[in-house]
Amino acid sequence: MWKDELCKLNGELPQGERLSRSFFTRDGLTVAKELLGKVLVHETPIGTVRGIITEVESYMGVEDKGSHTYGGRRTERSEPMFHIGGTSYVYFTYGMYHCMNIATDVEDNPQAVLIRSVVPADKESEERMPDLRLEASLASIRKRKEAKDEEVTPSEVERKKKSLLKHLADGPGKLCIAMGVNKQQNDVDMVKSKTFYVTEGVEVLPAEIQAGKRIGIDYAEEAADYLWRFFM
């Protein structure tokens, strides 16, 4: 079990080898399942953050009604999905959150995997992820307080940080904040990048992988029922 493996390492997963181009230039369903247990790495302004990927969704391109590229739609926003497998696709949604994907397969076959959830891969990431989440939350709180000519108190900061620990990076938006990911990380070649990439991680057995419906695509008709969300 992958959790047992991480426990034996005292929560300190060693740095693994970076994933090669050939890993990503396969179909999105295969890549999605094999991304589970791999480690997303981002060199942020406050230091390196590493997250073990625990939940993903596949978006299978022109024939997938849940995909941004269904029917061959090619827009400025979705352009990275048409790039070579291993290219990041980060977009802004609901006017609030970023979502991070990785393009798969060959160029001009616009498939991608949405990274939905990670857990810290080491003690430093366990400390830095809450700090990144906290800074984003405090910015919003300060704005509300300033409108009332009030200041954020130390006790409010502490309470907020504790509350963030319960659901640190278990959703696409929270994941991006905890990993320091935004539009600056869009359309990055994650095979070549020195600051934003994916490495080997923990072994995940086939029996540990569960499948379910993708979240938030009720509009996608029959595609809304595809079991293309994978988690462990």
Task: Identify what each model region corresponds to.
Residues 2-232:
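Conserved, well-structured core segments that form or line functional sites
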